[in-house]
Protein backbone atom coordinates (compact mmCIF):
# COMPACT_ATOMS: atom_id res chain seq x y z
CA UNK A 1 0.00 0.00 0.00
CA UNK A 2 1.28 3.47 -0.92
CA UNK A 3 1.77 5.91 1.95
CA UNK A 4 -0.52 8.95 1.88
CA UNK A 5 2.26 11.43 2.59
CA UNK A 6 3.64 10.85 -0.90
CA UNK A 7 3.48 13.60 -3.52
CA UNK A 8 2.61 12.71 -7.11
CA UNK A 9 2.89 14.66 -10.34
CA UNK A 10 -0.22 14.49 -12.53
CA UNK A 11 0.59 15.62 -16.07
CA UNK A 12 -2.34 16.44 -18.32
CA UNK A 13 -1.21 15.47 -21.81
CA UNK A 14 -4.77 16.21 -23.05
CA UNK A 15 -7.25 13.95 -24.75
CA UNK A 16 -8.94 14.24 -28.12
CA UNK A 17 -11.12 11.23 -28.80
CA UNK A 18 -14.27 10.93 -30.93
CA UNK A 19 -16.37 11.41 -27.77
CA UNK A 20 -13.95 13.09 -25.35
CA UNK A 21 -12.14 16.41 -25.58
CA UNK A 22 -9.72 17.85 -23.07
CA UNK A 23 -7.50 20.31 -24.95
CA UNK A 24 -7.60 23.85 -23.48
CA UNK A 25 -9.82 25.66 -22.92
CA UNK A 26 -11.48 22.29 -22.21
CA UNK A 27 -10.52 20.15 -19.24
CA UNK A 28 -11.08 16.46 -19.90
CA UNK A 29 -12.83 14.03 -17.59
CA UNK A 30 -10.21 11.25 -17.57
CA UNK A 31 -7.53 13.47 -16.05
CA UNK A 32 -10.06 14.60 -13.43
CA UNK A 33 -10.86 10.99 -12.53
CA UNK A 34 -7.14 10.36 -11.95
CA UNK A 35 -7.04 13.34 -9.60
CA UNK A 36 -10.22 12.05 -7.97
CA UNK A 37 -8.43 8.80 -7.12
CA UNK A 38 -5.58 10.69 -5.45
CA UNK A 39 -8.11 12.85 -3.58
CA UNK A 40 -9.87 9.72 -2.32
CA UNK A 41 -6.59 8.26 -1.08
CA UNK A 42 -5.66 11.63 0.47
CA UNK A 43 -2.37 11.65 -1.44
CA UNK A 44 -0.80 15.02 -2.16
CA UNK A 45 -0.20 15.77 -5.83
CA UNK A 46 0.68 18.50 -8.27
CA UNK A 47 -1.35 19.05 -11.44
CA UNK A 48 0.31 20.46 -14.55
CA UNK A 49 -0.69 20.71 -18.18
CA UNK A 50 1.76 19.57 -20.83
CA UNK A 51 1.96 23.18 -22.02
CA UNK A 52 3.01 24.34 -18.55
CA UNK A 53 5.63 21.58 -18.53
CA UNK A 54 6.96 22.71 -21.92
CA UNK A 55 7.49 26.22 -20.54
CA UNK A 56 9.66 24.94 -17.68
CA UNK A 57 13.43 25.14 -17.97
CA UNK A 58 15.54 22.01 -17.53
CA UNK A 59 16.45 23.17 -14.02
CA UNK A 60 12.77 23.68 -13.13
CA UNK A 61 11.84 20.25 -14.48
CA UNK A 62 14.59 18.58 -12.49
CA UNK A 63 13.42 20.36 -9.34
CA UNK A 64 9.81 19.28 -9.88
CA UNK A 65 10.76 15.64 -10.47
CA UNK A 66 13.15 15.61 -7.53
CA UNK A 67 10.25 16.21 -5.16
CA UNK A 68 7.75 13.64 -6.48
CA UNK A 69 7.23 10.06 -5.41
CA UNK A 70 4.93 9.04 -8.27
CA UNK A 71 3.97 10.13 -11.78
CA UNK A 72 0.85 9.72 -13.91
CA UNK A 73 0.07 11.12 -17.37
CA UNK A 74 -2.99 10.99 -19.61
CA UNK A 75 -2.18 10.96 -23.33
CA UNK A 76 -5.44 10.58 -25.20
CA UNK A 77 -5.18 12.43 -28.49
CA UNK A 78 -6.28 9.92 -31.14
CA UNK A 79 -8.17 12.37 -33.36
CA UNK A 80 -5.82 14.63 -35.33
CA UNK A 81 -6.79 18.27 -35.11
CA UNK A 82 -5.67 21.87 -35.05
CA UNK A 83 -5.64 23.44 -31.63
CA UNK A 84 -5.75 27.04 -30.47
CA UNK A 85 -4.77 27.05 -26.78
CA UNK A 86 -2.75 23.87 -26.38
CA UNK A 87 -1.14 20.90 -28.12
CA UNK A 88 -1.50 17.30 -26.90
CA UNK A 89 1.58 15.41 -25.76
CA UNK A 90 3.33 13.48 -28.52
CA UNK A 91 4.90 10.03 -28.43
CA UNK A 92 8.34 11.62 -28.69
CA UNK A 93 7.66 13.90 -25.72
CA UNK A 94 6.32 10.95 -23.73
CA UNK A 95 9.50 8.98 -24.38
CA UNK A 96 11.65 11.93 -23.31
CA UNK A 97 9.61 12.35 -20.14
CA UNK A 98 10.01 8.71 -19.23
CA UNK A 99 13.77 8.89 -19.68
CA UNK A 100 13.89 11.90 -17.35
CA UNK A 101 11.83 10.44 -14.52
CA UNK A 102 13.63 9.31 -11.36
CA UNK A 103 14.09 5.56 -11.78
CA UNK A 104 12.86 4.71 -8.30
CA UNK A 105 9.35 6.23 -8.62
CA UNK A 106 6.27 4.47 -10.06
CA UNK A 107 5.07 5.91 -13.37
CA UNK A 108 1.73 5.40 -15.10
CA UNK A 109 0.80 6.42 -18.65
CA UNK A 110 -2.79 6.03 -19.80
CA UNK A 111 -5.23 7.16 -22.46
CA UNK A 112 -6.17 5.92 -25.91
CA UNK A 113 -3.09 7.43 -27.52
CA UNK A 114 -0.95 5.24 -25.26
CA UNK A 115 -3.01 2.23 -26.23
CA UNK A 116 -2.49 3.01 -29.92
CA UNK A 117 1.23 3.64 -29.50
CA UNK A 118 1.59 0.37 -27.62
CA UNK A 119 -0.16 -1.56 -30.39
CA UNK A 120 2.31 -0.02 -32.84
CA UNK A 121 5.25 -1.29 -30.78
CA UNK A 122 5.93 1.57 -28.37
CA UNK A 123 7.38 -0.05 -25.27
CA UNK A 124 9.69 2.26 -23.29
CA UNK A 125 12.18 0.41 -21.11
CA UNK A 126 12.01 1.59 -17.53
CA UNK A 127 11.49 -0.13 -14.18
CA UNK A 128 8.10 0.41 -12.51
CA UNK A 129 6.52 1.90 -15.65
CA UNK A 130 3.00 0.78 -16.51
CA UNK A 131 1.09 1.53 -19.73
CA UNK A 132 -2.61 1.31 -18.93
CA UNK A 133 -4.90 0.02 -21.67
CA UNK A 134 -8.09 -0.01 -19.61
CA UNK A 135 -9.22 2.67 -17.13
CA UNK A 136 -6.20 4.68 -16.00
CA UNK A 137 -7.98 5.85 -12.86
CA UNK A 138 -8.94 2.32 -11.78
CA UNK A 139 -5.43 1.07 -12.58
CA UNK A 140 -3.93 3.81 -10.40
CA UNK A 141 -6.40 3.03 -7.62
CA UNK A 142 -5.40 -0.64 -7.69
CA UNK A 143 -1.73 0.26 -7.44
CA UNK A 144 -2.29 2.62 -4.52
CA UNK A 145 -4.15 -0.14 -2.67
CA UNK A 146 -1.87 -3.08 -3.43
CA UNK A 147 1.48 -1.68 -4.58
CA UNK A 148 1.34 -3.67 -7.83
CA UNK A 149 0.22 -2.81 -11.35
CA UNK A 150 -2.54 -4.50 -13.33
CA UNK A 151 -5.13 -3.39 -15.87
CA UNK A 152 -8.44 -2.57 -14.20
CA UNK A 153 -11.85 -1.10 -14.99
CA UNK A 154 -13.78 1.21 -12.72
CA UNK A 155 -17.10 0.21 -11.18
CA UNK A 156 -20.17 2.43 -11.43
CA UNK A 157 -19.68 3.44 -7.79
CA UNK A 158 -16.05 4.38 -8.44
CA UNK A 159 -17.13 6.31 -11.53
CA UNK A 160 -19.43 8.49 -9.44
CA UNK A 161 -16.91 8.94 -6.62
CA UNK A 162 -13.95 9.89 -8.80
CA UNK A 163 -16.05 12.11 -11.06
CA UNK A 164 -17.36 14.09 -8.09
CA UNK A 165 -13.99 14.31 -6.34
CA UNK A 166 -12.36 15.23 -9.64
CA UNK A 167 -14.81 18.08 -10.12
CA UNK A 168 -13.15 19.99 -7.27
CA UNK A 169 -9.65 18.60 -7.77
CA UNK A 170 -6.49 20.44 -8.77
CA UNK A 171 -7.20 19.54 -12.40
CA UNK A 172 -9.94 22.17 -12.15
CA UNK A 173 -8.89 24.65 -9.45
CA UNK A 174 -5.28 24.81 -10.71
CA UNK A 175 -6.14 24.75 -14.41
CA UNK A 176 -4.63 27.82 -16.11
CA UNK A 177 -7.89 28.56 -17.93
CA UNK A 178 -10.10 28.70 -14.81
CA UNK A 179 -9.10 32.28 -14.06
CA UNK A 180 -9.81 34.07 -10.79
CA UNK A 181 -12.92 35.04 -8.85
CA UNK A 182 -12.55 38.57 -10.19
CA UNK A 183 -12.01 37.47 -13.78
CA UNK A 184 -13.02 33.99 -14.85
CA UNK A 185 -11.18 32.38 -17.74
CA UNK A 186 -12.57 30.39 -20.69
CA UNK A 187 -12.33 26.96 -19.01
CA UNK A 188 -14.97 24.56 -20.35
CA UNK A 189 -15.77 21.53 -18.24
CA UNK A 190 -16.29 18.43 -20.39
CA UNK A 191 -18.56 16.09 -18.42
CA UNK A 192 -18.95 12.41 -19.31
CA UNK A 193 -22.59 11.47 -19.86
CA UNK A 194 -22.04 7.89 -21.00
CA UNK A 195 -19.37 5.67 -22.48
CA UNK A 196 -19.53 3.21 -25.34
CA UNK A 197 -21.45 3.28 -28.61
CA UNK A 198 -24.83 1.96 -29.74
CA UNK A 199 -23.02 0.58 -32.79
CA UNK A 200 -20.85 -1.63 -30.58
CA UNK A 201 -21.63 -4.72 -32.69
CA UNK A 202 -20.50 -3.24 -36.00
CA UNK A 203 -19.22 0.29 -35.59
CA UNK A 204 -17.12 2.46 -37.88
CA UNK A 205 -13.87 0.58 -38.52
CA UNK A 206 -11.61 3.56 -37.86
CA UNK A 207 -13.25 4.55 -34.56
CA UNK A 208 -12.27 3.58 -31.00
CA UNK A 209 -15.72 4.11 -29.48
CA UNK A 210 -17.35 0.78 -30.52
CA UNK A 211 -14.41 -0.98 -28.82
CA UNK A 212 -15.69 0.39 -25.50
CA UNK A 213 -18.72 -1.88 -25.83
CA UNK A 214 -22.38 -1.51 -24.91
CA UNK A 215 -23.15 2.00 -23.67
CA UNK A 216 -23.05 2.51 -19.91
CA UNK A 217 -25.19 5.45 -18.87
CA UNK A 218 -24.74 7.82 -15.98
CA UNK A 219 -27.97 9.07 -14.43
CA UNK A 220 -29.03 12.70 -14.88
CA UNK A 221 -28.85 13.15 -11.10
CA UNK A 222 -25.25 11.90 -10.96
CA UNK A 223 -24.12 14.24 -13.74
CA UNK A 224 -25.97 17.25 -12.32
CA UNK A 225 -24.38 16.70 -8.91
CA UNK A 226 -20.89 16.51 -10.42
CA UNK A 227 -21.41 19.74 -12.33
CA UNK A 228 -22.68 21.46 -9.16
CA UNK A 229 -19.40 20.56 -7.46
CA UNK A 230 -17.54 22.06 -10.43
CA UNK A 231 -19.60 25.25 -10.17
CA UNK A 232 -18.62 25.48 -6.49
CA UNK A 233 -14.98 26.03 -7.50
CA UNK A 234 -15.69 28.54 -10.26
CA UNK A 235 -16.59 26.57 -13.39
CA UNK A 236 -19.06 28.45 -15.60
CA UNK A 237 -19.01 26.65 -18.94
CA UNK A 238 -19.95 22.99 -19.55
CA UNK A 239 -20.06 20.66 -22.51
CA UNK A 240 -21.81 17.30 -22.46
CA UNK A 241 -19.18 14.80 -23.60
CA UNK A 242 -18.53 11.09 -23.66
CA UNK A 243 -21.54 10.64 -25.93
CA UNK A 244 -21.09 9.19 -29.38
CA UNK A 245 -24.63 10.38 -29.99
CA UNK A 246 -26.63 12.87 -27.92
CA UNK A 247 -29.85 11.31 -29.25
CA UNK A 248 -29.13 7.82 -27.92
CA UNK A 249 -28.62 8.75 -24.26
CA UNK A 250 -30.67 6.07 -22.46
CA UNK A 251 -32.23 5.05 -25.80
CA UNK A 252 -34.54 2.07 -26.15
CA UNK A 253 -33.45 -1.13 -27.91
CA UNK A 254 -29.72 -0.48 -27.78
CA UNK A 255 -28.85 -4.19 -27.75
CA UNK A 256 -31.54 -5.29 -30.19
CA UNK A 257 -32.08 -2.59 -32.81
CA UNK A 258 -29.87 -1.28 -35.59
CA UNK A 259 -31.36 2.15 -34.96
CA UNK A 260 -32.17 2.42 -31.23
CA UNK A 261 -35.17 4.63 -30.44
CA UNK A 262 -34.26 7.97 -28.82
CA UNK A 263 -35.72 8.58 -25.36
CA UNK A 264 -36.55 12.29 -24.95
CA UNK A 265 -37.22 12.24 -21.18
CA UNK A 266 -33.73 11.51 -19.69
CA UNK A 267 -31.86 14.04 -21.84
CA UNK A 268 -34.53 16.66 -21.05
CA UNK A 269 -34.20 15.92 -17.34
CA UNK A 270 -30.42 16.31 -17.59
CA UNK A 271 -30.46 19.52 -19.61
CA UNK A 272 -33.18 21.27 -17.61
CA UNK A 273 -31.55 20.12 -14.37
CA UNK A 274 -28.24 21.66 -15.39
CA UNK A 275 -29.97 24.88 -16.42
CA UNK A 276 -31.57 25.25 -12.98
CA UNK A 277 -28.18 26.30 -11.62
CA UNK A 278 -27.82 29.99 -12.37
CA UNK A 279 -24.02 29.72 -12.24
CA UNK A 280 -24.05 27.85 -15.55
CA UNK A 281 -23.34 30.13 -18.49
CA UNK A 282 -22.37 28.30 -21.70
CA UNK A 283 -23.88 24.83 -22.16
CA UNK A 284 -23.06 22.84 -25.29
CA UNK A 285 -23.06 19.22 -26.44
CA UNK A 286 -21.00 17.23 -28.93
CA UNK A 287 -21.98 14.37 -31.24
CA UNK A 288 -25.14 13.34 -33.04
CA UNK A 289 -25.77 10.33 -35.27
CA UNK A 290 -27.69 11.40 -38.40
CA UNK A 291 -28.96 7.88 -39.10
CA UNK A 292 -30.56 7.62 -35.65
CA UNK A 293 -32.26 10.99 -36.17
CA UNK A 294 -33.40 10.15 -39.71
CA UNK A 295 -34.85 6.77 -38.75
CA UNK A 296 -36.60 8.13 -35.63
CA UNK A 297 -37.93 11.54 -36.64
CA UNK A 298 -40.68 11.90 -34.01
CA UNK A 299 -38.62 11.38 -30.81
CA UNK A 300 -35.65 13.12 -32.44
CA UNK A 301 -37.81 16.18 -33.04
CA UNK A 302 -38.71 16.32 -29.35
CA UNK A 303 -35.05 16.05 -28.33
CA UNK A 304 -34.04 18.70 -30.87
CA UNK A 305 -36.58 21.13 -29.40
CA UNK A 306 -35.15 20.48 -25.92
CA UNK A 307 -31.60 21.09 -27.16
CA UNK A 308 -32.61 24.37 -28.79
CA UNK A 309 -34.41 25.44 -25.60
CA UNK A 310 -31.59 24.65 -23.17
CA UNK A 311 -28.25 24.90 -24.99
CA UNK A 312 -26.42 28.17 -25.47
CA UNK A 313 -26.48 29.62 -28.96
CA UNK A 314 -23.57 28.59 -31.14
CA UNK A 315 -24.03 24.93 -30.17
CA UNK A 316 -22.80 22.31 -32.64
CA UNK A 317 -23.92 18.74 -33.22
CA UNK A 318 -20.99 16.91 -34.82
CA UNK A 319 -22.24 14.66 -37.63
CA UNK A 320 -19.79 12.00 -38.77
CA UNK A 321 -20.73 11.36 -42.38
CA UNK A 322 -17.01 10.80 -43.18
CA UNK A 323 -17.72 10.12 -46.87
CA UNK A 324 -20.57 10.52 -49.36
CA UNK A 325 -19.24 7.57 -51.40
CA UNK A 326 -21.44 4.44 -50.96
CA UNK A 327 -18.33 2.36 -51.62
CA UNK A 328 -16.52 3.86 -48.63
CA UNK A 329 -19.68 3.66 -46.54
CA UNK A 330 -19.98 -0.09 -47.10
CA UNK A 331 -16.30 -0.96 -46.63
CA UNK A 332 -15.93 0.98 -43.38
CA UNK A 333 -19.34 0.33 -41.80
CA UNK A 334 -20.06 4.05 -41.59
CA UNK A 335 -23.01 5.20 -39.53
CA UNK A 336 -25.08 7.11 -42.09
CA UNK A 337 -25.53 7.64 -45.80
CA UNK A 338 -26.14 10.87 -47.69
CA UNK A 339 -29.93 10.45 -47.66
CA UNK A 340 -30.05 9.99 -43.89
CA UNK A 341 -27.71 12.93 -43.45
CA UNK A 342 -30.03 15.22 -45.42
CA UNK A 343 -33.05 14.18 -43.33
CA UNK A 344 -31.16 14.91 -40.11
CA UNK A 345 -29.85 18.24 -41.41
CA UNK A 346 -33.35 19.37 -42.35
CA UNK A 347 -34.66 18.60 -38.87
CA UNK A 348 -31.83 20.38 -37.04
CA UNK A 349 -32.10 23.38 -39.37
CA UNK A 350 -35.87 23.57 -38.90
CA UNK A 351 -35.50 24.29 -35.18
CA UNK A 352 -31.86 25.20 -34.65
CA UNK A 353 -31.22 27.99 -37.14
CA UNK A 354 -33.04 30.60 -35.02
CA UNK A 355 -30.61 33.03 -33.43
CA UNK A 356 -29.96 33.31 -29.71
CA UNK A 357 -29.00 36.14 -27.41
CA UNK A 358 -25.43 36.31 -28.74
CA UNK A 359 -26.65 36.50 -32.32
CA UNK A 360 -25.56 32.97 -33.23
CA UNK A 361 -27.81 30.18 -34.53
CA UNK A 362 -28.97 28.15 -31.54
CA UNK A 363 -28.00 24.69 -32.85
CA UNK A 364 -26.43 23.68 -36.14
CA UNK A 365 -24.74 20.52 -37.40
CA UNK A 366 -21.01 20.28 -37.91
CA UNK A 367 -20.02 17.92 -40.70
CA UNK A 368 -17.00 15.61 -40.57
CA UNK A 369 -15.14 14.08 -43.52
CA UNK A 370 -12.24 11.63 -43.26
CA UNK A 371 -9.82 11.00 -46.12
CA UNK A 372 -7.95 7.74 -46.61
CA UNK A 373 -10.69 5.27 -45.67
CA UNK A 374 -10.71 1.96 -47.50
CA UNK A 375 -12.69 1.94 -50.73
CA UNK A 376 -11.88 5.55 -51.49
CA UNK A 377 -11.33 6.47 -55.14
CA UNK A 378 -10.82 9.58 -57.22
CA UNK A 379 -14.60 10.01 -57.62
CA UNK A 380 -15.06 10.00 -53.83
CA UNK A 381 -13.96 13.60 -53.53
CA UNK A 382 -16.33 14.68 -56.32
CA UNK A 383 -19.18 12.93 -54.50
CA UNK A 384 -18.30 14.72 -51.28
CA UNK A 385 -18.20 18.11 -52.99
CA UNK A 386 -21.42 17.45 -54.92
CA UNK A 387 -23.19 16.62 -51.66
CA UNK A 388 -22.03 19.85 -50.06
CA UNK A 389 -23.20 21.82 -53.09
CA UNK A 390 -26.62 20.15 -52.82
CA UNK A 391 -26.85 21.14 -49.15
CA UNK A 392 -25.90 24.72 -50.00
CA UNK A 393 -28.41 24.89 -52.85
CA UNK A 394 -31.15 23.66 -50.51
CA UNK A 395 -30.26 26.43 -48.05
CA UNK A 396 -29.24 24.09 -45.22
CA UNK A 397 -26.86 25.65 -42.71
CA UNK A 398 -23.74 24.02 -41.28
CA UNK A 399 -21.77 25.43 -38.35
CA UNK A 400 -18.46 24.06 -39.64
CA UNK A 401 -16.89 21.40 -41.87
CA UNK A 402 -13.99 19.29 -40.58
CA UNK A 403 -11.79 17.51 -43.12
CA UNK A 404 -9.30 15.10 -41.58
CA UNK A 405 -7.01 12.27 -42.61
CA UNK A 406 -7.51 8.83 -41.13
CA UNK A 407 -5.08 7.76 -38.40
CA UNK A 408 -3.81 4.25 -37.75
CA UNK A 409 -2.82 1.20 -39.75
CA UNK A 410 -4.77 -0.81 -42.29
CA UNK A 411 -6.05 2.10 -44.40
CA UNK A 412 -5.16 3.11 -47.92
CA UNK A 413 -2.93 5.89 -49.11
CA UNK A 414 -4.54 9.30 -49.59
CA UNK A 415 -4.39 10.71 -53.14
CA UNK A 416 -2.73 14.00 -52.25
CA UNK A 417 -3.78 15.96 -55.34
CA UNK A 418 -7.48 15.06 -55.11
CA UNK A 419 -7.46 15.61 -51.34
CA UNK A 420 -5.94 19.08 -51.62
CA UNK A 421 -8.31 20.03 -54.43
CA UNK A 422 -11.27 18.93 -52.32
CA UNK A 423 -10.13 20.89 -49.28
CA UNK A 424 -9.53 24.01 -51.35
CA UNK A 425 -12.89 23.70 -53.11
CA UNK A 426 -14.71 23.34 -49.78
CA UNK A 427 -12.98 26.36 -48.25
CA UNK A 428 -13.37 28.50 -51.39
CA UNK A 429 -16.89 27.60 -52.55
CA UNK A 430 -18.77 26.16 -49.54
CA UNK A 431 -17.41 27.76 -46.36
Task: State where each predicted segment sits.
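Conserved SAM/AdoMet-binding glycine-rich loop
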Residues: 1-4, 8-11, 228-376
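Glycine- and acidic-residue-enriched helix-capping/strand-helix junction motifs
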Residues: 16-31
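Catalytic cores of alpha/beta
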Residues: 118-125, 299-303, 373-391
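Glycine-rich beta-alpha loop elements in corrinoid/cobalamin-binding modules
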Residues: 47-164
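Short helix-loop-beta junction
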Residues: 32-45
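Flexible glycine/acidic-rich beta-alpha junction loops that bind and position SAM and/or redox cofactors
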Residues: 18, 81-82, 117-119, 205, ...
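Canonical Radical SAM [4Fe-4S] cluster-binding loop centered on the CxxxCxxC motif
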Residues: 183-222
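N-terminal [4Fe-4S]-dependent radical SAM core
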Residues: 15, 145-194, 203, 237
